Amino acid sequence: MAAPNLASTPAPEFRGRIYDSILDTVGATPLVRIKRLQAEYGVKADILAKLEFFNPLSSVKDRIGLAMIEALEADGTIGPDTVLVEPTSGNTGIALAFVAAAKGYKLILTMPESMSIERRKMLKLLGADIRLTPAANGMKGAIAAAEEILAEIPGSVMPQQFKNAANPAVHRRTTAEEIWLDTDGGADILISGVGTGGTLTGVGEVLKLSLIHISEPTILR
C-alpha cells in the first residue's frame, strides 16, 4: 500500500509551529459553536464555548499561573533561588506547579488533606512540595500554614492569586482580546464561572469598554 502524500494535505493554521517552551502554548484557545444546544432550545444566537482545556494543564488557570510568576519576575520580586509558596485547593496550584517546573522554581503548596489523591499525584509529578493541613480547618488552615512557611523561609514569596493584579490583567490582555478578535467584536453575552473572579473581571472590563450595550444583569434567575 502506497504511503499517503502528506505534503498535499492542507494543514490547519495552527500546524507547522515549533515552540521554544511549553509556556508559549498557554492561551489562544478556540471558540466552538455548540450547535446541538442551539437546536435543542431553539436559540437563534450563536452559543460559543471557549475551550480552556486546550491549555497545557487543561485549565484557564494556566493563564494566571504563568502571568503571576512572570509579573513577579518582571518587577524583580523573585529570582532563580526564590521559593514560591501558595495555599490552593484547585487548578491554580496545578498551574503554578507546571510553570514553576518549566522555569525551575521550587514551589511549596499548602492544601486541606481532603483534596483528592489524583490532584496530589498530579502536583507531585510536577515537582511541587505539598504540605497538607487538617480538613476541618478548610482553606483558612491552608492559608495559615502558607503564612507560617513564608515566615520560616527567608526571601520566599506568595503569588496570592486572590490579590494579585496579574490575575485579572492577563484576562484583559489575552482572554478578552481573543474573544473580541474571534467574534469580530460580536460578543453580546459573557457567561463565566467565578473563583477568584479574575476571568470575569478582566474580560468583563474589556468588553464593557468596547461594547456599550454590555452590562451586569440586574436580576439573577
What annotation goes with each model-predicted range?
Residues M1-E216, R221:
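PLP-dependent amino-acid enzyme catalytic core
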